[in-house]
């Protein structure tokens, strides 16, 4: 068991978090599983739900009040939550029975202030929590723009943000150069009379620029934001340590690489220039939309402009899918042959069989 999900540490962490919540003048705090990109998988430095509760599943949310707390999980994680999350510290709430909003409406004291980090929730989620707080006679309160997430403030051994090197996804596998993709998306924005689009989904940026990374488990993406304008220029906000001369040559003059801490200023500039900005409210953090609106930009709510063209697979991608299935089919066949030979001897468990299958797949990757 790693330090991040050691149940014996949870009481100490919960006390520290409640102290920080009180220091901020709040009566509670929402702890989602998500990071700033709203992805399913997050880097170790963004495992705030695991740090707070001990729960290491890929979906969940906790609400921590001054004298009680609850964790909300779907049916996949019922047994895992029982094993990882101390029942005496958190109410275990299956989502089929109790939603976060219904629990808040029932348990949040009248007049209380429930805090949230607008980097970690979408506008739709914020709206639903606002209704729940109103039903409780309480108030939903965003952290101040310059305030650290209270978990980050007390997470003394928090891992550093990932800095894995960016790699090129070759055109031979993508079936399109990133210049072709860029023109396609830019032309689509121009046709809709949209000046620019803010991209927050890491898979969209990886697809658009034909790049890959290793910032999060199981998904070869880079944690980055991007702004693409209708003339085909791109601002890419990413830790410079992830870049190499090869990547800079690949991106060329069309892409301006900037440090992540300049992202807010870039959004402000869009407002100063009175730009019409496409933003996907279903996937972008509420912070991004709030910053754009405050700056004076005209927010055009709509789908991420990369999602539809990304879904249309090229001939090269289809060939890659078929090749992957052939490799995986060979691995599975070897596994079934192994299982047929070894199972009669006994001693094979579900876990050991899964390990064997994974090793065969890795050998054939």
Cite the ranges covered by each PLM segment.
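Terminal domain-start leader segments
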Residues: 1-276, 280-365
